[in-house]
Amino acid sequence: MQEFSLWCDFIERDFLENDFLKLINKGAICGATSNPSLFCEAITKSAFYQDEIAKLKGKKAKEIYETLALKDILQASSALMPLYEKDPNNGYISLEIDPFLEDDAIKSIDEAKRLFKTLNRPNVMIKVPASESAFEVISALAQASIPINVTLVFSPKIAGEIAQILAKEARKRAVISVFVSRFDKEIDPLVPQNLQAQSGIMNATECYYQINQHANKLISTLFASTGVKSNSLAKDYYIKALCFKNSINTAPLDALNAYLLDPNTECQTPLKITEIEAFKKELKTHNIDLENTAQKLLKEGLIAFKQSFEKLLSSF
């Protein structure tokens, strides 16, 4: 399916040297993403970083982090470069800016430009969280011809506004990362069974429609947070349900591997807006508003990435 791309939402040194290459070589994935939580998990729990950390002892914590993280990003970039050279819409790896800068546009812009210049790779995307300062940051990076991944997008309204900016100003590839499964984790305990495991897909589909109103060949919806939070769902539930044209799904390894055992042969037709509106109306009878939930999940997501980054830095 040329219209749909699968990326890997995982990064870790041993993985990059082994299974990551296998996934690329067999055509299973054509991109990858990282975030502060993934780096925290990898660096604090994997033995493959310990010798390097020991050699960096005495340096500032953020300097140690960047030395380790940028090495991984460069390795992923090199592995994905043949895909990028064949088709500049594919073959990207994402690196997120310091999550503690999310409310400071100027510092966010400076850090993003510094990281992109340091890495000096055309297939690196700089990740920017969809905080209040994001619009200024996105605009500046787009004008600087930096590939962008706008992350922690929960609201269809925000998704559309971001797409509008990128449609006007993006000179390089850009994706808008719409988070999915966290909606179901939040809402399912509050609704009857017939409404469960649907909120994430409904909201993500509405985001997809909003983005596509402005999307061009440089801009795509990227569905993220697509690992299931419930044992009752198939591991690849969110990949299969959101297999839309001109979209990307970045998935954790368990979801990715499950999907590859039985992949879709063609893209899904998205739910109609009328179906989404009917579902939202049904949710409101249970005092649930998806836009309010989106705002709550964004705040929690920003906090979670800060906590992971702080935990990682303190481990040094």
From Swiss-Prot:
User: Which Pfam families does the record cross-reference, listed alphabetically?
Assistant: TAL_FSA
Give the PANTHER family listed for this entry: TRANSALDOLASE
Please report which protein family the annotation says this sequence is part of. Belongs to the transaldolase family. Type 2 subfamily.
Name the top EC class.
transferase
Is Transferase a UniProt keyword of this protein?
yes
Identify the domain of life: Bacteria
Q: Is-annotated flag, keyword Membrane?
A: no
Which InterPro entries does its entry note?
A: Aldolase_TIM (IPR013785), TAL/FSA (IPR001585), Transaldolase_2 (IPR004732), Transaldolase_AS (IPR018225)
Instruction: Give a short account of what the protein does.
Output: Transaldolase is important for the balance of metabolites in the pentose-phosphate pathway.
* PROSITE patterns given in the database record: TRANSALDOLASE_1
Q: In which pathway does it act?
A: Carbohydrate degradation; pentose phosphate pathway; D-glyceraldehyde 3-phosphate and beta-D-fructose 6-phosphate from D-ribose 5-phosphate and D-xylulose 5-phosphate (non-oxidative stage): step 2/3
| Protein name per the record | Transaldolase
Q: Name one GO molecular function term.
A: transaldolase activity
Gene Ontology CC, one term: cytoplasm
Where it sits in the cell: the answer is: Cytoplasm
Q: Where is the active site?
A: K127
What is the protein's major site of localization? cytoplasm
